[in-house]
Design a protein with these regions (language model features):
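Compositionally biased accessory segments in Actinobacterial proteins
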Residues: 1-269
Length: 269
């Protein structure tokens, strides 16, 4: 059988900014989860429209439900002290979340669970509720009002929001256990994506997603993961030359910008 010409075509790399609008399709989230299973010792169970991935210790489960797309969270990560115990913490992914956020979350979860499972499941060794983030004040503004705190992008399209469990603010999504919420909702598009974390989620998991979202640099992505057309008018895309044509001695003028020196913001509880 002849080779598929699409398989022989080299994939391009592109820079997308701002990175919080570099949306990805839920089907790509499932593809990423498939790759995750292939590269780890986690087990997978496939249903008619679902993919459930379970850690070797059976205490962490990741469920992707294609039928939930557009109606609520289509990927849910949950932790229990054992298979029969009540849920200890939960992370929910809805909409066109940038695949880099999903990859960072899965990679951090798997790596930390392999080295320090009690930290992931029980929070042992972590300072509860403490998260230190570094942001570019030219790209994000800090706020602390009406029982909520966090950061909002200067264009108003995205936010990272903290709601303590004892806050007077209304519960996020009607769930008082949700303490962190990251979302993008451009005015011309409406709800684009969101990720929420409940109270006992290990801070390092939130940090992996928040740091990716707040990073002011463009995101580097392969065209293997296409950008949904709905956000095309809202982002800037720069196509990079193939690796064989890129200079090796010095970076090109149009290459990825250097990471700016991080600027410290107050610790947020």
């Amino acid at each position: 059988m002849p080779n598929d010409p699409d398989q022989d075509r080299p994939r391009e790399e592109i820079l997308i900014s701002p990175r919080y609008l570099a949306a990805s399709l839920p089907t790509d989230h499932q593809l990423l989860l498939d790759i995750f299973v292939e590269e780890t010792a986690w087990s997978a169970h496939t249903g008619a429209s679902t993919l459930t991935v379970t850690s070797p210790c059976r205490r962490i489960a990741i469920r992707h439900d294609q039928t939930a797309v557009g109606r609520g969270p289509h990927m849910v990560i949950s932790a229990r002290t054992d298979e029969e115990a009540a849920e200890r913490w939960r992370a929910e992914i809805s909409g066109l979340v940038p695949i880099e956020c999903v990859a960072g979350l899965l990679g951090t979860l798997a790596g930390e669970l392999a080295t320090d499972p009690d930290h992931v499941v029980y929070g042992i060794g972590a300072e509860p509720g403490l998260l230190e983030l570094y942001v570019d004040p030219d790209s994000w503004a800090h706020f602390d009002d009406f029982g909520l705190s966090g950061f909002i992008s200067r264009d108003g399209h995205a936010a990272v929001v903290n709601r303590p469990v004892d806050s007077s603010a209304p519960p996020i999504h009607g769930d008082a256990s949700v303490t962190w919420h990251l979302a993008a909702s451009p005015e011309d598009v409406g709800h684009l994506w969101d990720i929420s974390f409940t109270e006992k989620t290990p801070p390092l998991l939130l940090h992996a997603v928040a740091a990716e979202t707040l990073d002011p640099r463009p995101t580097l992505r392969s065209t293997s993961f296409p950008l949904p057309g709905v956000v095309a008018p809202l982002v800037t895309i720069e196509r990079l030359p193939p690796p064989s044509t890129r200079p090796t001695a010095q970076p090109s003028q149009g290459g990825p910008p250097r990471r700016p020196e991080p600027k410290r913001t107050p610790k947020t509880r």
